[in-house]
Amino acid sequence: MQRIDHSLPWSHLGTERTLSVFRYGAGTRKVYIQASLHADELPGMRTAWELKKRLAELESNGQLQGVIELVPVANPIGLDQHLQGSHMGRFELGSGKNFNRSFVELSAPVAELIGDQLGGDAQANIVLIRQTMGQVLDGLPAPLSQLEAMHRLLLRHACEADITLDLHCGQCCGKA
């Protein structure tokens, strides 16, 4: 297992937040799994931590056929937000923005850059699309907030995957 820690910029003085990605296995195929983008949706995070243990076992036994990237805590910003004893993980307190909205829109700029380059070779098309998504992300101006930086990191990992899972649990979770 490889742990990739991304320090989020724009922290408050004397503080730091980190987005941790756990990478298991090797190969050309990749599955990307993130949990708790709404940081108050804790069942997804719990499931991801249990999956983390299982993936470590599978990797140590050589049973993984490809790469699995797991982000059990996809939103360290929201996980750290509390107001008068209540967890506030759905919206960023400073801006009021929903953590699961306002990701960079890639489809239009990617389509424009690719133009008519897609052909009959599906694998070559996948490579071209992923490279172009990376190119678009690289060409963006610097993020203006910690939320923007976090979104871009999550998006970059997801864009490289063959399968992406975003674990959510609605408002009713854990309530009788």
Name every feature range the model reports, one short phrase each:
Residues M1-A176:
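Structured catalytic-domain cores with a bias toward divalent-metal coordination
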